[in-house]
């Protein structure tokens, strides 16, 4: 076991917890839990104009829903601005940073010139060794790091391998803006150091930041945490992930009826593998997870695969647990609020009895809820478009005769109603399917449902006879 592992998840509260962020949080959580360490949560809210309380709540709620818990109190980066500023001033006093008085116009000119010449280095270092007495009046300076001018900056990344940057291509990055606020680069380094972070696991879009941050670590004489830059998530065609491909917030997946355990399982396999195993319990994930098994190439998001996995979790879920998930989902899924007032002890018991048949067909909680609507339906039932043309006068007459037969069943169950219907079919020279479909339409308003005899048993004799009355003709 690695001693005292501390990971962190550090989202910016400028929007929802997106699917890539959720996977990053999961990887950090799994690594910390495997090694008996801590996963800390830091909200990087220094962008005051874009950070919102609603976004913070969405991030916290999304993590809780996914079952990703964090250790210690949440750290809010903005509350540590004074500490960040002190470090910048310390570097300035030690001659490791300097005040830069370049005007916005000068900086724009430098950038254009660098791009025209094909240089990565945008700032020309003009204030690095210049006498501050030459500073223009009334211009608030930035504080820049005195980055090394030659040599290499090297990261031994746990996923990307050895990554090397030539220092001549890296300019003196800004640590403190003219208004006294710290830059992201400085704040992240100071916070990770002060929080005791030992492992930084994040998206590989941060890899260039790693070079800048290592220079700050080196200048301060602080130990660099172990870094692991994980591949981004792409769409199924290899393009940048879009909303159409799954670039949605965790809250959207909740509203689409995915189970948190299924989404966790799906996310862990995006970029990480453990042989051919696809299904993992939470403990199996923790036991097996390792940074060395994360690939370098972008993972591809596949909605169909997620849906199939979700269906597996629904089918294998305990019925009582699934009823609880069903109830919780009513607050989030489309039209869920319509059913909420109708969920009482009686309908909950019916739902529990129906669950073995319902869950076999459902790939999402939305499908599960939709297929269970017959339990909660008001009389007379509203027939769906496919059912209406099948309810002919002959069919209605048949339903009336079926109702008369079912009324004679004394001990109501799936078995007794099936026996009565089979006897009716034989006596009238009918196939069972010719009876089942009219029954299904009359009892559920649809052409598809769980097994018709399960439907009869779940609804009970009184409700079934009443619904058959509504759709029958003498």
From Swiss-Prot:
Its EC number is 6.1.1.17. It comes from Nitrobacter hamburgensis (strain DSM 10229 / NCIMB 13809 / X14). Belongs to the class-I aminoacyl-tRNA synthetase family. Glutamate--tRNA ligase type 1 subfamily. Keywords: Aminoacyl-tRNA synthetase, ATP-binding, Cytoplasm, Ligase, Nucleotide-binding, Protein biosynthesis. GO terms for biological process: glutamyl-tRNA aminoacylation. It comes from the Bacteria. GO terms for molecular function: ATP binding; glutamate-tRNA ligase activity; tRNA binding; zinc ion binding. It is found in: Cytoplasm. It is an enzyme of class 6 (ligase). This is Glutamate--tRNA ligase. A motif ('KMSKS' region) lies at residues 240-244. It catalyses: tRNA(Glu) + L-glutamate + ATP = L-glutamyl-tRNA(Glu) + AMP + diphosphate. ATP binds at residue 243.
